[in-house]
Amino acid sequence: MQFRHEVKHKISNLDMLILRQRLGAVMAPDCHAPNGEYEVRSLYFDNLEDKALREKLDGVYVREKYRIRLYNNDPSVIHLERKFKRGALGHKDSALLTPEQARRIAGGDVRWMAESANSVILGFYSRICSEGLAAKAIVDYTRKAFVFGPGNVRVTLDSHIRTALRSTDFLNPHCATVPVPDSPCIHDPEGL
């Protein structure tokens, strides 16, 4: 299992503009962002007690979460992701989903997952059954990403953060989301 250092910082809009300029001078744009930015939509899963959210807010040293993610509202590539954190180190495993599989999971129709040969899907199914994980929130944001080959460094700047609580309409590009109050920009430098 290969881990990356992940550190997140809340920054102001002014700091984001300055960082975009400075990073653009020394780092390459992420290959997934041909026009410089891309949209991220994630559907997060948690139990009735919001265990994953509470562990993140409390800074629990070892934790994991599951989400379904797509980019630029393009349903042709949808990922089920398991994100595992050990302190500031993070590791991500993913499995491709069809739009129909994503809809079924979001709606709570998960029995089919027990027959999957994919370890991420099986692990998620196990957590759904043992902990009662269910779709909890949609989070949308705009990401500007930079990469630097030596050291495997990746820096992302996230802005325009929006959410839809208790919504599972993940694949609807017109799903109603609201801005997160006092939404900061997130500066997330990652590296090996």
Stretches with model-predicted labels:
Residues M1-L192:
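Phosphate-end processing signature that detects enzymes handling 5′-triphosphorylated RNA
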